[in-house]
Amino acid sequence: MPPIKTAVLGTGVSAFVFHFPFLEALPSKFEIYACLERRATVTQSKARSAYPNILVYTNLDELLADVNIELVVVSLPPNVHSEIVKKALNAGKHVVCEKPFTPTYEEAKELYELAESKSLLLAIYQNRRWDGDFLTAKKIIESGRLGQVVEFESHFDRYRLGRKSGSWKDEPRPGNGMVYGIGSHLIDQAVSLFGTPYSVTAKLEAQRQIPPLEVEDYFRIILHYPAKGNKLPINVILSSTNVSCGCEMRFCIKGTRGSFMKFGFDPQESQLHSGMKPNDHGFGTDRFELYGNLWTVPLDADVKALPEPTKITVPTVQGNYRDFYDAVFEEILKKANEFPIKSDQVLAVEKIMEAAYKSSESSSSIQL
């Protein structure tokens, strides 16, 4: 199969940091064929400066009318995702869409139904499934060394008291805010591990007051999974703030036979911003000092006479967002319905985000 002719919609940070580098890293699978750059001129184009042979369109309808384009990557603000994804699917294109997918569950459901009716792939860019720290946490949970997990805490905390002037991300428009931003990643990771929760309890706030924000920049969301059969209840705690000076706990997982704690962020984003490429040696490799710690007791330990836990350092799994695009290629090629980011998971994330807002507004838990 020749490389899939791909068009990227947008020329912002998302396109140049999270999409172009990974398409470029897989030349036998994807051809960077076209780009939507509305402000491009004959002499000035960000896309053409980076990729001299790329076709640059300033009009979406003209791009979608190009019969050579097989895959469209939607790397635009979330308030336009629904409209553009729908147009792309109706034009017969496979679609990769940046997160957050859509502002509402109903929009997302309609688009998945449209994609299915046309036998097209609709892939949401939940690249943080391939964060090394998350892959490490997942591996430890699946190994059973923690026993039954009863609490899974996931943070994404930064120290950013200021904000960029004029940033669309801080405007009160559909799909904006911390929950739809990093929250959609943390929720997706939780759903991929534990499935859809029974209920959601959340608190959302605007913590930075320089100047006051019109959208939330803090959340604490608890996903409740009740006891089922011989399984203990699980509480999943997801939290993010921009007011966290020097404390970067990423995961804290507690089970009946052990605990795991990890600090620091996955290195891929900072590596990409610094110009490192996905195929470069060391890409996605964590620093030794940020390796997580695992405390365990034997699985068959007597609960009435538990020994002192044994502590070991756990090397971080090497992540690579390139694996997302590998999976996109395989699904388009084989149509095997094996793409790892399933439609029911994406729809669960949409429901949880909507429930988080309702919970915070009503100061109550929302049953899904």
UniProtKB/Swiss-Prot annotation:
One Gene Ontology molecular-function label: oxidoreductase activity
Pfam families: GFO_IDH_MocA, GFO_IDH_MocA_C
Protein name, as recorded: Uncharacterized oxidoreductase C115.03
Alphabetized InterPro entries for the sequence: Gfo/Idh/MocA-like_OxRdtase_C, Gfo/Idh/MocA-like_OxRdtase_N, Gfo/Idh/MocA_oxidoreduct, NAD(P)-bd_dom_sf
GO cellular component: cytosol; nucleus
Organism: Schizosaccharomyces pombe (strain 972 / ATCC 24843) (Fission yeast)
UniProt family annotation: Belongs to the Gfo/Idh/MocA family.
Record's keyword terms, sorted: Oxidoreductase
Swiss-Prot/TrEMBL GO biological process terms: negative regulation of transcription by RNA polymerase II
EC number(s) recorded for this UniProt protein: 1.-.-.-
